[in-house]
Amino acid sequence: MKKVFKKCAPTPVYISPNQLTLDCFKTPFEQQLNHTNRWVVLAHLIPWDEVCNLYLKHVGVSDTGRPPLNPRVVLGSLIIKHMCNLDDRETVDQISENIYMQYFLGYSTFTSEAPFDASLFVEFRKRLGMDTLNAINEKIASLKTHMETKEKETTPTTDLEPLPDNSNSTESKNKGRIIFDATACPQDIAYPTDLDLLSDARKKSEELIDKLYSPALHVKKPRTYRRIARKLYLGTAQKKNKSRKQIRKATGSQLRLIKRNLKSINRLLDTYPQIPLKPKDYKYLLVINTFYEQQQQMYDSQSHRIEDRIVSIHQPHVRPIVRGKSQAKVEFGAKIHVSIIDGISFLDELSWDAFNEGSHMMDYVEKYHLRFGCYPRELLADQIYCTRANRAALKEKGIKLLAKPLGRPSAVQVHVSPGERNPIEGKFRQAKTAYGLNRIKAKLRDTSESWIASIILVLNLVKLAGVALPCFIVKFIDNLYASFSARWLIVPDSQFAYDNCGQLILMTEIFNSNKNNPKKRFLSFSADPI
């Protein structure tokens, strides 16, 4: 097999910095952009009019105040951020430096100015929400179905194709294959231990006392013993090996200090006609009260289990998700259920509490019916979905379950091979490794949901871009061919179909149709006249 060498840029000759000037630096901005660049392909792939209308319908347009940002800039910036796995500030810097990204956002000319302040990303995630991003994902994912429909229309039918078997009318109406699976999306928080969480709650309660104390209303400021409390905490936390007795003793001391601080906060609040705290601080107060009750109950019963356990003072919506994996038996974040249909991912459910995906399987099947107007022909799922009730419900709807059958193992293995579920496992690996699904850095509940939905959207865009790239290459080549055909009076033998996006056979057809005409083949793939 002949080795393919990648063409690299020429290595520049070293020049002293004293001889380099910014004005003399040559730029390629006067040349045409590369048509095969990923941002150019995505810019032509996304239906911006429909997507922007969905955004404006959800956000709304006000006649007063500052004019809103361009919806394409808002949505495109989120796509760039998650596709490149950048933080908010780095995303703004990359956009101001990259001409292809600016073309993707709809800019007509290059500008070195930042499109907006990086802090607006938080507002974008708040405004969009998971539902709007899922609607945009559905709209973009429909492009795959549209491509396949046009491909079937352009593909000629032959008499050798077998006729459809209508022996089972219910099963014949079902179309497609669907793969189910669930995973956890860990939040960017420290691993929670009771002692560390108690220390965080104690320090936050001390801050609330400082904010509530007023010399005009209170004679003496309540004592918090923060130095002693910090010393007691570090005395145990910094030990390499801690016994149960030492941990219980340190936990009890922190609980008593938090109880004292909460009593002081209540006495300070009694002197005010209304609660003077800001909404954010008042939320911290409610979280600390709930957290103290949970920890005190576990301390008294000497257990480590409780319902709706708080694992982060700053993100109280996060819950522990028991996964049973070898690397992490418990993950802290949201649990999502994803279905894959022909390489396209759909976010079926997102919950901050653990749930059994097998008990919700028929709800996911009904969502497939809402999207495509029919039930799937085949369903591929893990063992947790294959209960007797689910098997009976799928059989009633004519859906074939590709899983190990119940009962005594047969002599011939007929169940599905483990590699059949590789596509969805690969999607999870791609999302967690390349796009940051294994570390959600958003702090709020709604912004975290938008973060996860944006990553699912990026997965589909990457998939569709890989399908559509050969189509854009062929279209660009044929445009060059058409421009030179008029000059050289060359009439093409046949019109190439561009609707078959992603079919590698198109490139072969172009070579085969022109192989007997060297002049024509040269004009089809070269922009230089002979």
Question: Would you name each region that the model predicts?
Answer:
Residues 37, 75-77, 91-95, 117-121, ...:
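Short, conserved catalytic/metal-binding motifs centered on acidic residues
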Residues 284-286, 292-299, 416-500, 504-510:
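Basic, amphipathic alpha-helical segments enriched in Lys/Arg and hydrophobic/aromatic residues
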Residues 108, 112-315:
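Active-site- or DNA-interface-adjacent structural scaffold in DNA-acting proteins
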Residues 325-371:
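Electropositive, glycine- and tryptophan-enriched low-complexity nucleic-acid-binding patches
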Residues 1-47, 409, 469-530:
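Charged, often Cys/His-bearing segments associated with DNA-binding zinc-finger transcription factors
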Residues 65-69, 82, 99, 380-389, ...:
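Acidic, metal-coordinating catalytic cores used for nucleic-acid/nucleotide bond scission
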Residues 33-79, 83:
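Basic, short loop/linker segments at the boundary and entry of helix-turn-helix/winged-helix-like folds
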